[in-house]
Amino acid sequence: MKKFLKYVLRPHWKLIIIILILSGFQTYFQLEIIDLFNSALNCVKQENMDLILNIGETMLVYTMLSMICMLIISVIATNVSANCAYETRRNIFHILMNLPSEEVGKFKITGLMSRTARGVYTEQGFIEMLLKNVLLIPFVITGITILILFIHIHFALIFVAANALIFIILFFKMKKVVELYFKAKKTYGRINSLFLERITEVKNNIKHSNKEDFKDACDDSYDKNIKYQLNQYYIAPILFLILDGIILILMAMISLGYSICIDTVNIVDSVVIIQYLVYFVTTLTFVPKLIYKFPKAYATSVRIEEVLVLEDKIDTKIKNKKINFKKFEFKNRKSRNSRKISNIDRRETRKKFGLLLSNYRFKFIFSFILLTISTLCIVYAPKVVGNIVNLFTNGNNVVEHEVIFTNILLLAILYIAGYLLQAYSNRIMIFIAEKITYNLRIQMYDKLKNSKIINEKSESNILSRINNDLVNVRDFIMVHASEIFAQLLSITLVLILIWTTDWRLSIIYFIAVPIYAICFYHFDANSKKSYEVHQELLGNLMGFKRDCLENHELIRLKNQQENVESDFKTINFEIKNKYTSSRYHSGLMSPLATFLTNLRNIIVYICGIYLLMNGEIQLGTLLTIIIYGKLLTTPIKKLTASLTSVQTSYSSVKRVFEVIENYDEE
């Protein structure tokens, strides 16, 4: 992967430096907002409301600057990832069209097709995540460590140690997961080859004879994918459990300090440290998706490198230069110019997909029950943290110490139970998704004979539905369905608990959530059409490339490399444009979410400090409200990211059902 990333990102090093600089500024502005809140808290004893309002104005300025940084990073990252994908597809095609036929013959056609379409698409998404999210983490860790170091050196060391532990777990665990994914990935090649044979048989009215082989290939793929998934589904919950464990250690340190009369961490400082930790956790919302995508991106990069390293073997000699050939044409050329998206009714598609999922409704219900309990545990935890802080500020008698340690124990139980139940819910969804994928593969294979699509689309366009679209459907069931449920549930529960904590401050959140929804719906509607067209174009690209590979020797004989590369460039450019146009809309969601979140937090800070100054609420209550605000931000950000996957998944579901349901009656 290192070679591939170096190959595709080197031409964009100047833009990457800009992203790094902006990531540093973004982190500074976000942490400065929290630091300003600390300054505002210290003004409570002085009862200087004018100074607090001035601090609020400064926070607003930093919020605007942070949003601008995020927006620029999003635009640059989208352009860089789109250009990397465009150049990679172009280079792969150029190499293959100019390689000697014996070199091309060493690869399976289906494998070369998938590298250009789904393979490059996978790398594109990974590169975008790398630029937008991963590059931000070193700045956040460094910034928080330095700020905590000024407050308490021992706790700064604990924070660094926890991050080192997370890195070690990721490094060694992901190494094994990648190896298992390579084994699972190999099974896709056999499935694609057998499915392509089936398409050819149906198109040419040849008697079908390979169903058992196809079923065996699906069985093998199911077994290896289950083994791969079971080795990585629990990694993200464990990492977040470690991060939340840092809060437990902080509470224990403060409690210990009060018990033995040692000034460990000032209560106000501890509130600020908790906010730093909560902000750090919110920046890691992408980690589960990164863990899921990394093995795919790693394996795909290796497969792409296998083609790119063949550039030295390109045969540049022009054959038959004196012969005047007409321009080479393909029988399936018309398929690539198709722009019309299937008119299958959206409601009907959702209904069919719902019926498919209903066969596993009891497992779904059980999984969602576990997820509900898990969410309840995690969402209730901030209330316990607030109670502990209130107990610290109430006095130092023995009874309160016992209650404090009881609350710390309760907090530990909530975190452990919450993340363990979340992991087991993920395990159930893995089996459901893999089984549905297995059944859909068999159905597509069986019903292909009578499908109308067999005469309407190219062979490779049909193949992309089992190679690309079915994988998207599986990912939606396995990851995004439960994610969306958990996110919506978290938002609902957080709003309820905020209301029960303090109804006055909760009004701010109840006003903010509909604004989030309206903005995100607008961006979602604008990006939907581009996603559907993008998926259709990927299918057409696979069809065009298959035509070229099957006629590779003839293309070279007639010196048509430049002509087919020109046609490929046209399709490739359209794919790039559709990707960037859809990502520009969805890419605005995260900066907008951050802006609205910071604006909401500033209002909560000012109003909360005013109530604290007048003795109407306690410090622990304000901290609980603030943590709930961060906890509300996390599912909202995840929900915005999930919208992208929902659009891709929805268009993929339509394309799968076009094969299964759109058939001629015998």
Each model region followed by its residue ranges:
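Transmembrane helix-loop-helix hairpins at lipid-water interfaces of multipass membrane proteins
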Residues: 13-72, 76, 149-156, 263-267, ...
